[in-house]
């Protein structure tokens, strides 16, 4: 899927990549089959607003309804490809995550229960300036619906601090919303104007850099505390790990990821290869990683 129809005030993507356009499901499935035949074990389905897959085309031919989710159909088709171990996707949009989509993620065994749902701000005033098309309450309602439909889920997000005219009150609303959700990880950016965007043209970059930096650090500290608590629940559990290879930080250890996209480090055993699925008993956790031992039958 290419392009974007959202036109957020700070983003250049719609101006450089054009409107949303989706590839046909058969073409995607054929590409996945070729990749799997070549040894690929995990597929990432990528789009600026991936849950809007097929929406533009459905609106053109008059088949779009509130229950429409061609992306759920795509997930089901890719899930049926033999030899594929896991399916990930990014990034969904608040307005295109309906019950059909949530049920597909829940029921399809190869689909990872990971949702990267960009927030950007917890302030309705700032969200409106950003042209994000949802309110903080609508965002939280979307998170609630997903959590109700899925017993175990990983949430990550994007946040911008220091957007033009952002006050301390606006920032604190963002901080509180992030605490309410409890994200597993977040990409937190300090605002900088992008040439050619509405925000660069119409809004003053009036938040001091030192204030942006401080707000960034506060959110990072909150995030680490929450992530450490979230990861602690995995201690003494057994997790299925898709092996990636030797750890970049410790050549004596190997690394892989859980279905919830948690990095897991472990000592290798004889015969292990990248792409294998192994069961690992988790012995220790941090805010960023899990550490365990492969269970040998």
What spans do the regions from the language model cover?
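Terminal RNA-binding accessory module
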Residues: 199-297
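Canonical Radical SAM [4Fe-4S] cluster-binding loop centered on the CxxxCxxC motif
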Residues: 1-26, 56-59, 200
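Conserved SAM/AdoMet-binding glycine-rich loop
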Residues: 37-168
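Conserved alpha-helical substructure of the radical SAM core
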Residues: 15-44
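Residues at the N-termini of beta-strands
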Residues: 10, 42, 86, 114, ...
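Conserved, mostly hydrophobic/aromatic
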Residues: 8, 28, 45, 89, ...
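N-terminal pre-triad scaffold of radical SAM enzymes
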Residues: 1-9, 33-37, 41-44, 241
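C-terminal, non-catalytic macromolecule-binding modules
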Residues: 169-219
